[in-house]
From Swiss-Prot:
Belongs to the metallo-dependent hydrolases superfamily. ATZ/TRZ family. It comes from Methanothermobacter thermautotrophicus (strain ATCC 29096 / DSM 1053 / JCM 10044 / NBRC 100330 / Delta H) (Methanobacterium thermoautotrophicum). Keywords: Hydrolase, Metal-binding, Zinc. Transmembrane segments: none annotated. This is Putative aminohydrolase MTH_994. InterPro entries: Amidohydro-rel, Metal-dep_hydrolase_composite, Metal_Hydrolase, MTA/SAH_deaminase.
C-alpha cells in the first residue's frame, strides 16, 4: 500500500471548489480520506502555506499540431484547418512519424509543467494517429483521452457500412470519435458516429459554430444551424459554440450537452468570443481547452486568465472566477473521471503558492509554473 498525506492545506473541495483547511490521505492513487485528524503514517507534505487544487484538465487540444507552431497566421481559418486539404492537414501528412512523436511528447511535457494532469485530444490520422500519440506519451505522468477520426467521414460516396466499419476501427484504439465539424459531414454520417460511440461506451464530440460562415452555410443548405444538427445526431460534447444563432443555446441546455470553450483560439483566429456568461446563466456545463497548438501554447493558466477577463469585458458585467476554475477542473469529471477533490476520486492535484487572499484569483491571475510547488498524479509526486 502506497500512502501519501497532504497536511494542513487549503483544499478546494468538491465540485464547487469550496476552500477548506483539511488533511488529505491518499492511498494507492485514490483520495481515501479528507479529515481534520492527523494521519498516523505515510509520506507527508506540509501544505500549510499552499492551496491544494485539482490538477488542471485541458479539454480540447490538437497536440499533433505541435509540428506546425505559428504557421499560417493571418490566413482564413478554413485555409488552415479545414480537412482534408487545410494547411495543417498537409503538414501532418508530410511529417515523419518520429518528428510527430517528438513534437507531441514535448507538448505533453509542457502541459505537465503547467499543472495539467489530463487532456482530451482530437487526433487526426485514423487508428495509426491515435496509436502514435499513445506511444508518444506512454511513459509520461499525464492522462490522454484521445478522440480519433477517419477521413472516410468526408467521403460523400462512402457507404453506410464502410463508414461504420472505419469508425469502429478508430474506436477500437481510441476513447471516442471527433470529426472536424458538421460542415464536412452529412447528418447521416453524424448519426452513425454517435451510434457507434454509444455502442462502444465512448465519447462522441464535434466542433460547432466556430465561425459565422459555417453557420450561414448550414442554415442555407439544411435549414438548421450546425448546433441543431449536432444535437439531433446526439453529440454530447460540443466544441467552440462561438457563434450561436436562433435557439442554439437553449437547445444545448435542453439536451444536456457540454460545451468546451476555446476563447484564446477564437481570438487568435478572429472568430469572435463565445457568449460565455449567457451559457453559464442557462446552466450549460462549460469546459475549457487551448485548441490548436498552431495558434496557442497548451497552458491552461493562460487560458483561464484570458477567459475570465474577456468574459467580463464582453458582458460588461462581473463573472465569478470560481466558475472559470471549475471549467478547467470539476466540470470535466463526467468525461475524465478527475477534476474533483473528494473521497474516492483519483489523487490528481496541484499544490500551489498562495499569492493573494482570493484562492481563485490567486490561481487564475497570478500563478505561473514556478508557483506550482507539487504536482501529484494518481497519488504520485511528479518531477516537472
Amino acid at each position: 500500500m502506497n500512502m501519501l498525506v497532504v497536511e494542513n492545506g487549503t483544499i478546494l473541495r468538491g465540485p464547487e471548489l469550496t476552500p477548506q483547511r483539511k488533511n488529505l490521505v491518499i492511498e494507492d492513487g485514490i483520495i481515501k480520506e479528507i479529515t481534520d485528524e492527523r494521519a498516523p503514517s505515510g509520506e507527508r507534505i506540509d501544505a500549510s502555506k499552499l492551496m491544494v487544487c485539482p490538477a488542471l484538465v485541458n479539454s480540447h487540444v490538437h497536440i499533433g499540431d505541435s509540428v506546425a507552431l505559428d504557421v499560417g497566421d493571418g490566413r482564413p481559418l478554413e485555409d488552415i484547418v479545414r480537412p482534408p486539404n487545410g494547411l495543417k492537414h498537409r503538414i501532418l501528412e508530410s511529417s515523419p512519424p518520429g518528428m510527430l512523436m517528438e513534437a507531441m511528447r514535448n507538448s505533453a511535457r509542457d502541459m505537465i509543467t503547467h499543472g495539467i494532469g489530463s487532456f482530451i485530444d482530437y487526433r487526426e490520422g485514423g487508428p495509426e494517429g491515435v496509436e502514435l500519440l499513445r506511444e508518444a506519451i506512454g511513459d509520461l505522468p499525464i492522462s490522454g483521452i484521445i478522440l480519433g477520426r477517419d477521413p472516410v467521414v468526408f467521403d460523400q460516396e462512402a457507404s453506410r457500412a464502410e463508414i461504420r466499419r472505419r469508425v469502429r476501427g478508430v474506436l477500437r484504439v481510441s476513447d471516442g470519435f471527433a470529426p472536424s465539424g458538421m460542415g464536412e459531414i452529412t447528418d447521416e454520417t453524424a448519426s452513425i458516429i454517435v451510434e457507434e460511440c454509444e455502442r462502444a461506451g465512448k465519447i462522441a464530440s464535434i466542433h460547432v459554430a466556430e465561425h459565422r460562415e459555417s453557420q450561414r452555410r448550414s442554415l442555407e443548405d439544411t435549414g438548421m444551424s450546425e448546433v441543431e444538427r449536432a444535437l439531433n445526431a446526439g453529440f454530447k460534447l460540443l466544441v467552440h459554440l462561438t457563434n450561436p444563432v436562433r435557439e442554439d443555446l437553449k437547445l444545448v441546455r435542453e439536451s444536456g450537452a457540454s460545451v468546451v470553450l476555446c476563447p484564446r483560439s477564437n481570438g487568435a483566429l478572429s472568430s469572435g468570443i463565445p457568449p460565455i456568461r449567457r451559457m453559464h446563466e442557462l446552466g450549460i456545463n462549460l469546459l475549457l481547452g487551448t485548441d490548436n497548438l498552431m495558434f496557442n501554447s497548451p497552458d491552461m493558466l493562460r487560458e483561464m486568465e484570458y477567459t475570465l477577463k474577456v468574459t467580463r469585458g464582453c458582458a460588461r458585467r462581473y463573472f465569478p472566477p470560481v466558475e472559470v476554475l471549475r471549467m478547467a477542473t470539476s466540470n470535466t469529471s463526467a468525461f475524465t473521471g478527475t477534476g474533483v477533490i473528494e473521497e474516492g476520486f483519483p489523487a490528481d492535484l496541484i499544490l500551489v503558492e498562495k499569492l493573494s487572499g482570493d484562492p481563485y484569483l490567486s490561481i487564475i491571475n497570478r500563478t505561473e509554473s514556478k508557483n506550482i510547488i507539487y504536482l501529484i498524479i494518481k497519488g504520485k509526486l511528479v518531477k516537472r
